[in-house]
Amino acid sequence: MHDQDALIHPQAVVAPGYLANHAARVFNRLVDAQLRPHGVSLALIGPIMLLSWKGPMLQRDMVIASAIKQPAMVALLDKLEGLGLIKRTPTPQDRRAALVALTARGRRIATLGGKVLIDLNAQALQGFSAEEAQQTVLLMQRLIANLEQHGQSL
């Protein structure tokens, strides 16, 4: 038990939902701390990583492929374009639709972001055996699936 646990309700300390949320907050804070010196944040790295993975995409397809709603995606892309990390160009088929692509600087930030995420995930599993790490991933996937299934019935 950690000293901090005394400040948290005893039921929360052993509740999977609380623990998953707390782990995510700590992880996100650490990612932001490593990305901030490079002028980006965890919120901005998501679309960058998506473009790095999929290549140039239509803005509307980025919304579909992510958990980000259209207005928030537009704001993120405006910010990324202002930082010189992406370039939006109208498509010849529909000049209202924008094709979004990483710039050279955006590709460098994607490489950095990928490294930060991989390194922090490895740090989170430090001291775990390969079997424990695999079991943790499987259990988290089941936890998420259970919650998503429950959410569909609401």
Residues covered by each model-derived region:
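N-terminal helix-turn-helix DNA-binding core of bacterial DNA-binding proteins
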Residues: 11, 18-21, 25-72, 83, ...
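Short secondary-structure boundary/capping segments
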Residues: 8, 64, 90-92
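Charged, amphipathic alpha-helical coiled-coil/dimerization segments
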Residues: 28, 56, 78-141, 145
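Short, flexible segments with low predicted structural confidence
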Residues: 2-8, 18-19, 33-35, 44-45, ...
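Short alpha-helical transmembrane interface motifs in multi-pass membrane proteins
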Residues: 13-17, 103-106
